[in-house]
Swiss-Prot record:
Its cofactor is Zn(2+). It is an enzyme of class 3 (hydrolase). This is 1D-myo-inositol 2-acetamido-2-deoxy-alpha-D-glucopyranoside deacetylase 1. Binds 1 zinc ion per subunit. Catalyzes the deacetylation of 1D-myo-inositol 2-acetamido-2-deoxy-alpha-D-glucopyranoside (GlcNAc-Ins) in the mycothiol biosynthesis pathway. HAMAP family: MshB. GO terms for molecular function: N-acetylglucosaminylinositol deacetylase activity; zinc ion binding. SUPFAM superfamilies: LmbE-like. The lineage of its organism: Bacteria, Bacillati, Actinomycetota, Actinomycetes, Frankiales. Zn(2+) binds at residues 4, 7, 140. The keyword Zinc applies.
Length: 289
């Protein structure tokens, strides 16, 4: 479950494309908001912003549809329906106080919205952010809280019986940035020609990218065959990021390397057998199909 359009591809794009290509695996993307409070990189679309026409959310639905097509994901849902909860903006922004914002969402109501999907789809695995929302965005934090709550609520026969038959999800993963992977990627960027031609104001700071110690990472999904699909999906979110080869920059000016290998921490459930790396190499490791 992701907070805004574009989050899915940055953190989990290669993983989603990898599993979407497997006809025996169903990938369902749930997005919590339309990303209405985002900035806009394209000058001719600048008036779509929330402080102008406030039409960015609708435009980003189209970007998300194109990104899903690039990843091969055919089942996408907005939590509670498109527009049910609004992008809260960055932490401490005035928009955090908007009663429509996801940050202000009633946890029980939001959990029930996700439980309805879980009980319909009956997944073995769920994926979301860690408790600080990867980098402290209020919607990412709320997405974590709602997913953890729904993981438990979906299996509780007394919770929202109108939302379907109870279902116990086997594993819950949190996305992660491996510290070693971040350092290697930043080093690669500084050594590349892109570092010499990066636009003014673009930074590539490893210290600014919140990461986790390698020892905490439980699962590493290597999907080099789907790197091109991930990059294509990134390009679909053209109001939010620029992409040049393996390098991308968000509207805040921070540059990162797109990753074909994505890392996770198992938060709930039993780990499967490790690969040669000592980490799981499959989110479904140890599970019976």
């Amino acid at each position: 479950m992701h907070a805004h359009p574009d989050d899915e591809v940055i953190a989990t794009g290669a993983t989603m494309a990898h599993y979407a290509a497997d006809r025996d695996t169903r990938v369902v993307l749930v997005t919590c908001t339309l990303g209405e409070m985002g900035e806009v990189l394209i000058p001719e679309l600048i008036n779509l912003r929330a402080d102008h026409a406030d039409q960015l959310g609708g435009y980003r639905i189209g970007e998300l549809e194109r990104a899903c097509a690039a990843l091969g994901v055919t089942d996408h849902r907005f939590l509670g329906g498109a527009g049910r909860w609004r992008d809260s903006g960055m932490m401490s922004s005035p928009s955090n106080a908007d009663p429509r914002s996801f940050w202000r969402a009633d946890l029980t109501a939001a959990s029930e919205a996700l439980v309805r999907i879980v009980r319909e789809v009956r997944p073995q695995v769920m994926v979301t952010y860690d408790a600080i929302g990867d980098y402290g965005h209020p919607d990412h934090i709320r997405a974590h809280d709602v997913t953890v709550r729904a993981f438990d609520d979906a299996a509780d026969p007394d919770f929202a019986p109108q939302a379907g038959e109870p279902w116990q999800v086997s594993k819950l993963y949190e996305t992660a940035l491996s510290r070693a992977a971040v350092d290697a990627a930043v080093d690669q960027l500084w050594r590349s020609d892109l570092a010499k031609t990066a636009p003014e104001g673009i930074s590539m700071p490893s210290d600014m990218l919140l990461s986790v110690p390698d020892a905490k990472v439980t699962t590493r999904i290597e999907a080099p065959d789907f790197f091109a699909a991930k990059v294509e999906a990134m390009r679909a979110h053209r109001t939010q990021m620029t992409v040049d080869g393996f390098f991308f920059a968000l509207v805040n000016g921070d540059g990162q390397a797109a990753r074909a290998t994505e890392h996770y921490v198992l938060a709930r459930g039993t780990p499967g057998p490790p690969a040669a790396s000592g980490k799981e190499d499959d989110l479904f490791a140890g599970l019976v199909p």
